[in-house]
């Protein structure tokens, strides 16, 4: 895998930095594991914008990724690594011994021909999935479940990982990349190693059009709008003279948004600022 800076053959290419991985499959994805992925344009079922700056972009098919990794005791061979337009991480197509194929998140160091396995008897090596009560303390894991059997929810983006720092009876304590320390049930599964494609963070799109290809629309400052469009709009100068708010009048800097008291007891230490 290499980080390549493009030659300035045009203004749009001058600042482009891309990640090149010659090991990625160059053909079409595995058709039985594809689903239609309709674009919402950031609108809900009432047609109202619920998420701004979304719209357009290239058509994409959704790859059905196995986040549960629940085929216990059946070894699988990695057939190939693939690009996935729906996430920052790459995915791997694996063939199980019983003939079934599934997509999984590609951990760092995984390559075609490698063997992986799930279950309590799986070896402690990157790509294998086990309940966290069977994983040594201090190990680095990804695709971590928060409820047994629900499928991985933590550490799924490119280059991310979680560290198991303690095990106490029915719970393990995890250190997340944000600095948060959190308890989850020891029967929750996790995949050993960290997610691959860590160089994803080094890429530079180089021009606004590349963001539009990805379905990202422009972000306009509230102070540049009219009063009818935003609480910061209007006025003769640039100062809006009030506390920063969203277009709907909600405080936007420092206001707490978390309201899940039910799971507060599982957070040992809050994330670092």
Curated annotation (Swiss-Prot):
Named from the GO MF annotations, one term is: transferase activity
Q: Which GO terms describe its cellular component?
A: cytoplasm; cytosol; cytosolic large ribosomal subunit; DnaA-L2 complex
Which Gene Ontology terms describe the biological processes this protein takes part in? cytoplasmic translation; negative regulation of DNA-templated DNA replication initiation; ribosomal large subunit assembly
Q: Which residues carry this modification: N6-acetyllysine?
A: 242
Task: Keyword check for RNA-binding, yes or no.
Answer: yes
Q: Which Pfam families match?
A: Ribosomal_L2, Ribosomal_L2_C
Q: Where is the composition biased (Low complexity)?
A: 39-48
Start and end residues of each stretch annotated as Disordered: 28-53, 221-273
Q: Cross-referenced InterPro entries, in alphabetical order?
A: NA-bd_OB-fold, Rib_uL2_dom2, Ribosomal_uL2, Ribosomal_uL2_bac/org-type, Ribosomal_uL2_C, Ribosomal_uL2_CS, Ribosomal_uL2_dom3, Ribosomal_uL2_RNA-bd_dom
Entry superkingdom? Bacteria
Keyword annotations of the record = Acetylation, Ribonucleoprotein, Ribosomal protein, RNA-binding, rRNA-binding
Described function = One of the primary rRNA binding proteins. Located near the base of the L1 stalk, it is probably also mobile. Required for association of the 30S and 50S subunits to form the 70S ribosome, for tRNA binding and peptide bond formation. It has been suggested to have peptidyltransferase activity; this is highly controversial. In the E.coli 70S ribosome in the initiation state it has been modeled to make several contacts with the 16S rRNA (forming bridge B7b, PubMed:12809609); these contacts are broken in the model with bound EF-G.
Which PANTHER family does the entry mention? Answer: LARGE RIBOSOMAL SUBUNIT PROTEIN UL2M, RIBOSOMAL PROTEIN L2
What is the annotated quaternary arrangement, including any partners? Part of the 50S ribosomal subunit. Forms a bridge to the 30S subunit in the 70S ribosome, contacting the 16S rRNA. Interacts weakly with S6 in one of the 3.5 A resolved structures. In pull-down experiments interacts with CedA.
By sequence similarity, the record places it as follows: Belongs to the universal ribosomal protein uL2 family.
Matching HAMAP family: Ribosomal_uL2_B
Cite any additional comment in the entry.
This protein can be partially replaced in vivo by its H.marismortui (HmaL2) or human (L8, from the 60S cytoplasmic ribosome) homolog.
The protein's name in its UniProt record: Large ribosomal subunit protein uL2
Q: Which organism is it from?
A: Escherichia coli (strain K12)
